[in-house]
Amino acid sequence: MANIKETYVDYLGFKTYCKIFEPENPDPAKKPLLVLHGGPGDCHNYLLTYGELADRVGRRVIFYDQIGCGKSMIPHQEDDFYTYDLWVNEFYTVREALGLDDIHLFGNSWGGMLGMLCMMKDDTGVNSFVINSSPVRIQTWLDEANRLLKYMPQDMQDALAEAERTGNYDTPEAKAAADEYYKRHVVGFSENDPNYPQMVKESCAGVGECYMIMQGASEFVVTGKMRDWDIREGVKSIKIPCMALSGTDDEGTPYTIKEGVDLIPDCEWTLIQGAPHIANATHPEECLQAVEGFISRFD
């Protein structure tokens, strides 16, 4: 069994929490995999299935909670504290502190967006990058979310439209509609399902204020700072080997993901049949095989 180590990295006077899966039988040919979670502010727990690569192939796997969430939670900050550069600079700080100078990179959702920003800035020491359901343009993401909503029952569409109008997503009707959307396109389970993944519950419990500031009140509208997200030109400069990973039932729809695949030079793409946004929650084996199959080519 992998030895799980926990540590903290100093960052801006705060502490960034890191969790490291150290293989019992490490393969020296396998470079470490650094995993970036989504949100911003969703924390690392829901991606822990990728830690299984430590036992399976002898690969070191590193997770961290980005500043402002989970075990890297901080006191309330003014909105201008939370910027893209906050997490970009943290990425390089964590790597330097942990000696991660020769790695593979994985990012889910916002984590993939963050990874793209970092690879556009400085890709030194990154051998490959798996971009898991991450948009290069937020408006495409929103247009597709609105298209997916039209396949839901009319009363649920109406409830979410009313929630968007009032800003109140806490009504029973809006909660039920959001749960249905999350079951179909995000988690793959209803909140009331006894099989709802514990790792997702733990991530939800650790969400920080940065989610509301950057994203907004829901997955269907972006009212925060990410509303102008568009890196279509920037990703053309990414030089390292990349693979997009997404699901057919993903809120990051194939149309959304293809936009990035077409722009990132020589980007490959693995599309998992029936998988939602958190594909590893419903299709863990397919995700592990896809990720290891890609990154092992660049060890």
Where in the sequence are the language-model features?
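N-terminal cap/lid segment of alpha/beta-hydrolase-fold proteins
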Residues: 1-15
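Conserved HGGG/HGGXW glycine-rich cap/lid loop of the alpha/beta-hydrolase fold
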Residues: 14-74, 78
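Active-site loop/oxyanion-hole signature of alpha/beta-hydrolase fold enzymes
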Residues: 63-110
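Conserved hydrolase catalytic core segment
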Residues: 101-144
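Flexible "cap/lid" loop of the alpha/beta hydrolase fold
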Residues: 129-168
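Alpha/beta-hydrolase
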Residues: 150-151, 158-240
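Conserved loop-alpha-helix segment in the C-terminal half of the alpha/beta-hydrolase fold
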Residues: 232-275
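Catalytic active-site module of serine/aspartate enzymes centered on a nucleophile-bearing elbow/loop
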Residues: 266-299
